[in-house]
């Protein structure tokens, strides 16, 4: 961490867990296991020591947002419609964004029992493979230019305006957008938007996705740790694909393991690492909170914007 983080306060896990005294985890180990991504590592202690204080912090931000909205309505002398509290979550491929997103969704729903908590990933706003192939961009999938940013920003604007909005659905099994399938959102109380690109701005220099966020999180780790997690996940995906001929990864299951690992390392170096170093990691200081993971996937440090 460099002077890039001069606007953040560094908090150790030991200090962070003392900021919230509730000891009940709000979910069972079985529920936690069911929402944990392939090859991620999280347990009930992580929920109690890291995520319950985080839920409490999000509540602080939500109350502040509601107070500001109310004060604005008084100033403008008009009613302001209740709008979703939007949380953006970013980080590298294989760093554990999906686990964090699903866990926050569950914990927020358990904490705010009458609230609706929705989750959407920016994968759905990738251009379909057919479009990427047509424009000779398939090898740039995941890079900023492979996303339909106009569609994504329009979605966020519609949701933030309290209107019903729809998002395309992406499948990692087929490695493509699912044809004729949409995910619909009708003014939820909370919306979590997760993706590698949520702090990026590719096309319109005057508008960032983060302009719509009320809170934002970056999941951080050393790149050599993320590479190891990526390779482990790739091998696990190959195991699953052996029993599913329709799975995108089936085409790689016939490779000897050493060749499969060599292929995955090449993909990591030429695509994922380049994307991380050039486009993802440089945006992390736009987050309100950075959760740093150690080699064992455990969060060891927290950085909160001052």
From Swiss-Prot:
It comes from the Bacteria. ATP binds at residues 91-98. GO terms for cellular component: cytoplasm. Pathway: Cofactor biosynthesis; coenzyme A biosynthesis; CoA from (R)-pantothenate: step 1/5. Keywords: ATP-binding, Coenzyme A biosynthesis, Cytoplasm, Kinase, Nucleotide-binding, Transferase. The keyword Cytoplasm applies. Its EC number is 2.7.1.33. Belongs to the prokaryotic pantothenate kinase family. This is Pantothenate kinase. It comes from Streptococcus equi subsp. equi (strain 4047).
């Amino acid at each position: 961490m460099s002077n890039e983080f001069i606007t953040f306060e560094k908090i150790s896990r030991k200090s962070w867990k003392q900021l919230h005294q509730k000891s009940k985890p709000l979910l069972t180990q079985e529920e936690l296991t069911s929402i944990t991504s392939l090859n991620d590592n999280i347990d009930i202690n992580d929920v109690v020591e890291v995520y319950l204080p985080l839920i409490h912090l999000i509540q602080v931000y939500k109350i502040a947002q509601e107070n500001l909205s109310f004060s604005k309505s008084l100033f403008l002398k008009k009613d302001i419609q209740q709008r979703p509290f939007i949380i953006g979550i970013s980080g590298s491929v294989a760093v554990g964004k999906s686990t964090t997103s699903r866990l926050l969704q569950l914990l927020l729903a358990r904490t705010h029992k009458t609230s609706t908590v929705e989750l959407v990933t920016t994968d759905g706003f990738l251009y379909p493979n057919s479009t990427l192939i047509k424009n000779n961009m398939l090898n740039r999938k995941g890079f900023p230019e492979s996303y339909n940013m106009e569609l994504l920003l329009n979605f966020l604007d519609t949701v933030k305006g309290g209107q019903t909005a729809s998002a395309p659905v992406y499948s990692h099994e087929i490695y493509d957008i699912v044809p004729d399938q949409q995910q619909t959102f009708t003014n939820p109380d909370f919306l979590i938007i997760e993706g590698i690109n949520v702090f990026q701005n590719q096309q319109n220099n005057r508008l960032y996705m983060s302009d719509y966020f009320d809170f934002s999180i970056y999941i951080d780790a050393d790149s050599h740790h993320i590479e190891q997690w990526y390779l482990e996940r790739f091998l696990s995906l190959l195991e699953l694909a052996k029993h599913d001929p329709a799975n995108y990864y089936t085409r790689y299951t016939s490779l000897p393991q050493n060749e499969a690992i060599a292929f995955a390392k090449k993909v990591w170096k030429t695509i994922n690492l380049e994307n991380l170093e050039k486009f993802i990691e440089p945006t992390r200081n736009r987050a309100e909170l950075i959760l740093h993971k150690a080699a064992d996937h455990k969060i060891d440090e927290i950085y909160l914007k001052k």
